[in-house]
Design a protein with these regions (language model features):
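Hydrophobic, well-ordered secondary-structure segments
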Residues: 15-22, 101, 107-108, 121
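A short hydrophobic beta-strand segment most commonly corresponding to one strand
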Residues: 63-64, 129-143
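Catalytic core of non-heme Fe(II) oxygenases with the double-stranded beta-helix
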Residues: 42-114, 141
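Hydrophobic beta-strand-centered segment that forms part of the acyl-chain substrate-binding groove
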Residues: 29-47
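Non-heme Fe(II)/2-oxoglutarate
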Residues: 1-32, 50
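A generic structural signal for short beta-strands and their flanking turns/coil linkers
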Residues: 36-40, 59-61, 131
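Short beta-strand His + acidic residue motifs that chelate non-heme Fe in jelly-roll/DSBH
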Residues: 51-54, 121-128
Length: 143
């Protein structure tokens, strides 16, 4: 993304600090010129709308920035990426971070969620009478 007058470029420039923080958390080397915004799109979910579970192939990191997130607009859900094992885990005596099957995040306006693109994720139904609005994007890390 080279056109500095385009909104996606300005948006990506503004969030670089957060992308760098994610790299540090994962223990990855961060080189600003090597992280590329490859795709960007917006989703408007009306009452009852949801996003089914999916992954983002051909990217390293994906993100969702919630522009509008009224109360009861749903939760962001991440599933265990070990798809083959999901139904084969033994019954849990104590739920822990190591045996968790899903993680949910209550969406709030202004949230920026950045996560590995291989993680299966979905967004639960919007139960609000107001629209839920999100700008999502994918990042590719050059070598």
């Amino acid at each position: 993304m080279k056109d500095k007058d385009k909104a996606p470029f300005k948006f990506f420039t503004d969030i670089q600090k957060y992308v760098a923080d994610v790299f540090r958390e994962y223990g990855w080397y961060y080189t600003p010129g090597k992280v590329n915004l490859t795709e960007m799109w917006a989703i408007i979910n009306k009452r009852g709308n949801f996003n089914t579970e999916h992954i983002h192939p051909n990217s390293n990191l994906s993100a969702a920035y919630y522009v509008k997130a009224p109360d009861n607009c749903g939760e962001f859900k991440v599933s265990n990426p070990h798809a083959i094992s999901r139904d084969k885990f033994p019954e849990r005596e104590n739920p822990t971070e190591l045996n968790r099957l899903i993680a949910k995040h209550k969406i709030e306006e202004g949230d920026l969620l950045i996560f590995p693109s291989y993680l299966p994720h979905s967004v639960l139904p919007n139960e609000s009478d107001e629209d839920r609005m999100v700008v999502s994007f994918n990042l590719w890390i050059g070598r």
